[in-house]
Amino acid sequence: MASAWPRSLPQILVLGFGLVLMRAAAGEQAPGTSPCSSGSSWSADLDKCMDCASCPARPHSDFCLGCAAAPPAHFRLLWPILGGALSLVLVLALVSSFLVWRRCRRREKFTTPIEETGGEGCPGVALIQ
């Protein structure tokens, strides 16, 4: 009886492999695989792909289990909020740049020395006359 077990193991494996091949040849869907595009799921009852958008109206349909969670709704205010925030940042940057420029310009008036004695290009005689 102990010698029958090793001989029957290959037979069981071959039988199991044959069943898998027959199931694949019959066209049945293996669990976890789907020939459907995104947004749709395979219905075993109807034997075709069904749109997941109909699941809120009929949540107990067999294909709704294959649909992912409801897709997130589009946030319609995203672009106006993003545009407003970027505009605010731009305005604040311009105002702060103007204030810094104005402050530096006020200090700049007294930092430029005025040449009172003349230079090499201006003789001292010309200053006296």
Swiss-Prot record:
Which stretches are TNFR-Cys repeats?
36-67
Q: Which Cys pairs are S-S linked?
A: C36-C49, C52-C67, C55-C64
> What induces or represses its expression, per the UniProt entry?
By FGF-1.
Tissue specificity annotation: Highly expressed in fetal heart, intestine, kidney, liver, lung and skin, and in adult heart and ovary. Intermediate expression in adult kidney, lung and skin.
> Which residue spans traverse the membrane?
81-101
In the bilayer, the protein is annotated as:
Single-pass type I membrane protein
Name any one Pfam family assigned in the record. Answer: stn_TNFRSF12A
User: Which residues constitute the signal peptide according to the record?
Assistant: 1-27
- Regions of this protein lying in the Cytoplasmic compartment: 102-129
Task: Give me the Extracellular side stretches, as residue ranges.
Answer: 28-80
Return the GO cellular component terms, semicolon-separated.
cell surface; plasma membrane; ruffle
- What keywords are assigned to this protein? Angiogenesis, Apoptosis, Cell adhesion, Developmental protein, Differentiation, Disulfide bond, Membrane, Receptor, Signal, Transmembrane, Transmembrane helix
GO BP annotation list: angiogenesis; cell adhesion; cell differentiation; extrinsic apoptotic signaling pathway; positive regulation of axon extension; positive regulation of extrinsic apoptotic signaling pathway; regulation of angiogenesis; regulation of wound healing
Query: Where found in the cell?
Result: Membrane
Q: What does this protein do?
A: Receptor for TNFSF12/TWEAK. Weak inducer of apoptosis in some cell types. Promotes angiogenesis and the proliferation of endothelial cells. May modulate cellular adhesion to matrix proteins.
Q: Which PANTHER family match?
A: TUMOR NECROSIS FACTOR RECEPTOR SUPERFAMILY MEMBER 12A
Q: Can you state the subunit structure given in the record?
A: Associates with TRAF1 and TRAF2, and probably also with TRAF3.
Q: What is this protein called?
A: Tumor necrosis factor receptor superfamily member 12A
| Organism for this UniProt entry | Mus musculus (Mouse)
The organism's lineage? Answer: Eukaryota, Metazoa, Chordata, Craniata, Vertebrata
